[in-house]
């Protein structure tokens, strides 16, 4: 004997089938983004936003076993693919362009390494390769992440390679949009987190160029909002300077971080010869805190030049302020953590208890 099939089970089957068909049609209409540098703070944030807006994403990584979990958890299943490849393996990279609508390059380095990771290779030759492939495969868009202040920093190898990369991109794919952000920060960065670690441990901290260098730090989420806007509004052939809502000197930045982690430290202006010597020493380390090239770069302000449109002028103003955002995650470096007793209990109350 068999049990009779209920009408409700039949209805649920057809409902599920219809929903599945609608989902497949929805995903078939989605655009495909190819992202290089997707495992970093900017890449992860961008993946979350693009996939929520029905973009399918392919992320290229050097080590799939190391980065797979970090990347896959940024999006729902079906919206993200991960490909392991060397970025200079043209045969493998070329195959990815056959099913791509938009290419986004977020790869960049702050210091050179011996095994091929030079400024020229990463910032100039690789973007040039991507731009040529974008043109060859008729991609709708290519978004390339560069850096702010590179026109002025003529004695910095980092800046020269970034500028050369921009020129190569526009030469090979004139429709490309180039973003020049100031310092990008978030809970996942290597900027504020490293500085707070050092300020937490060192009683004295050096000020290079008297701490007068100006920055316009932009939160990672504001930057990815800009990228998302550029894609959705089809903004082409532009250089866009991406800055935060405020200009802060290096000294002011350190003072804000010290206030947030509730520390008092002596900020000492470093003479240039001593700064150069310390940079040469740090270069001997695998991950140097400062290099000679970075020291040269620190001479120049990292703010909008006024020569190009900014993220605000294309309709996406930065809304996140440095101190307000860092306050959300700085407690990891503050004595007593998020619920520091001394911070929250008034002296009057402590006296009454005692």
Give, region by region, the residue ranges found by the protein language model.
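N-terminal Rossmann NAD(P)H-binding glycine-rich loop of SDR-like oxidoreductase domains
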Residues: 33-55
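Glycine/proline-rich active-site loop of Rossmann-fold NAD(P)-dependent oxidoreductases
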Residues: 186-194, 230-240, 246, 262-265
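Substrate-positioning beta->alpha
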Residues: 190-192, 210-231, 238-241, 252
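Glycine-rich Rossmann NAD(P)(H)-binding loop
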Residues: 208-213, 240-247, 258-262, 270, ...
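NAD(P)H-binding glycine-rich loop region in Rossmannoid oxidoreductase-like domains
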Residues: 65-129, 133-136, 148-152
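Conserved Rossmann-fold NAD(P)-dependent oxidoreductase catalytic core, especially the SDR/UDP-sugar
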Residues: 56, 109-110, 116-172, 176-182
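Flexible, glycine-rich beta-alpha linker
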Residues: 156, 179-196
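A hydrophobic C-terminal alpha-helical subdomain
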Residues: 273-354
